[in-house]
Regions:
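Active-site-adjacent beta-strand/loop module that shapes the phosphate/pyrophosphate-binding cleft
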Residues: 93-117, 127, 142-145, 149-150
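Residue-level preference for beta-strand/loop junctions
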Residues: 29, 53, 85, 101-103
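Conserved hydrophobic "DFG−1" position in protein kinase catalytic cores
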Residues: 37, 45, 108-109, 128
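Acidic, metal-coordinating catalytic segment for phosphate/diphosphate chemistry
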Residues: 1-34
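Nudix hydrolase/Nudix homology domain
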Residues: 53, 120-156
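Conserved Nudix-box catalytic region and its N-terminal flanking loop in Nudix hydrolases
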Residues: 33, 38-78
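A short coil-to-beta-strand element that immediately follows conserved catalytic motifs
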Residues: 83-92
């Protein structure tokens, strides 16, 4: 792995720790997106290079004034190199994480071709999983998003 990627990953980890300290003090309300991406009956999960590094759904924070669908499209382009996909709203979740009060807008997209180009700075790994063979170390929002998204869209 190139030194520039390793240094940028380190920067992400340091920035995340600093944000956690700020969130501990301020307890902000944040809006974000999580995207359930499926292909051939499998679910795409990612491991970020920062934070808990558990298997997670791709997604991220919404920018101020950014509509949820636009945020989902932007995050998928940034993290996975995914361009145009038919996105469907799949519900909304509320909860607390890392001292924040989160509103998570859930979206779903089915890819015909399961090719993604992960950003090596932000993502340590990407992997496709069968719904019955999900890893045990899932980020805490994954199961609620799956529960919310799958019934709303007729399953995988």
């Amino acid at each position: 792995m190139p030194l520039s990627v390793r240094l940028r990953r380190l920067g992400y980890r340091i920035a995340f720790r600093l944000l956690q300290a700020l969130w501990f003090v301020r307890r902000p309300r944040k809006s974000g997106v999580k995207c359930l991406i499926t292909s051939g009956g499998r679910i795409l999960l990612v491991r970020h290079t920062y934070g808990a590094r558990a298997w997670d759904l791709p997604g991220g924070a919404m920018r101020r004034g950014e509509p949820p669908l636009q945020a989902a499209r932007r995050e998928m382009q940034e993290e996975l190199g995914l361009g145009a996909a038919a996105w469907r709203a799949a519900g909304e979740l509320r909860g607390s994480d890392n001292f924040r009060h989160d509103v998570i807008h859930c979206f779903r997209a089915e890819l015909v071709e399961p090719t993604v180009r992960p950003d090596p700075v932000e993502l340590a790994m990407t992997q496709w999983f069968a719904p019955g063979a999900l890893p045990s170390d899932l980020a805490h929002y994954v199961r609620p998003v799956l529960d919310q998204a799958l019934p709303a869209t007729g399953g995988i």
